[in-house]
Amino acid sequence: MNLRDLVMVAVGGQIAHPLGRAPYRIGYDGVPRMLPATGGIVLNRRIGDRCVGLAGDHIEPGVALHNNSREVVGPRDGPNTALITYACVGNLARVITGPGTGKTGMVTGKHGGVNHVLVDFRPEVLRRLRIGDRIQIESCGLGLGLLDHPEITALNASPDLLLRWRLAERDGILHAPVTHLVPAAIMGSGLGKNTAWRGDYDIQLADPDIRRRYRLGSLRFGDMVAIVQADNRFGPTYRQGWVTVGVIVHGDSTASGHGPGVTPLLSGPMQRLRPVHAPHANLAVIFGLRALPPARSYRPLAGRPATGFGRVPRPTSTRRLARAGGL
């Protein structure tokens, strides 16, 4: 790596409040649901926990950051665009205001669309944080290059992550440990962008056969996964003979075309970049954040029998109602 050339820049943001939109979100199974979604401080889900089948939509584990400052020059959202661009997976994050001042965590991913940077903290720290607390990130990773593997592009990855990940070179091929393979054909929301530096794109889980074949029901926050036939150098693209390795950053979704989000980390031709199966290839293990819970397979929320909402009762005719004494 070109470690001597890299520049470390402090960037920051505030803990984002959850956003309220339409009261219901209609799932790809036709069922409307009311669920927690993006933003806020998620107290009981963090890196290493399952991300499929939760009673939530696009759940962001740990803390979601944005920067709502306004600059006198450039676009109005310039500070937040810089935050989501500069921050890289594995960067150190430090709380600089509020009761948790001085506590540290780690950047675990970026969520495009809502444009949040996600940070993991220990549970006892999460409960001391407040909405609006400021967090500063020691960003390092922009401009990172693999000098011995120029055909492979590094994106959104800190040098610390690549040093800890146990990447192995054999016969000129870089082997990257991953928990799952994902076919590029089922990637959804996030396609159509001209950069892969500012977010993620989603794995669709609606097809049960594909889900079972690739064991996608067992995905966890922080899992390293390989998207096969995908080139992310200049935005997410389907390209045969290429592979993109990334990290699961947010949870499943009931919305059509959406699902667990992947922030790209490495992208290159398969003859130079090769995924290898490693059940514990998760940020929780790579950085020693916590013991990794056993992987179990879960069904997505959409497609399950409706429980308490969303199921329309069979209409009752006036004649039947009269016979029952209702008229």
Regions inferred by a protein language model and the residue ranges of each:
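Epigenetic methyl-mark regulator signature
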Residues: 1-2
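Conserved mixed alpha/beta catalytic, RNA-binding, or beta-rich assembly cores of soluble enzyme
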Residues: 7-303
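Long, low-complexity, intrinsically disordered segments
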Residues: 309-327
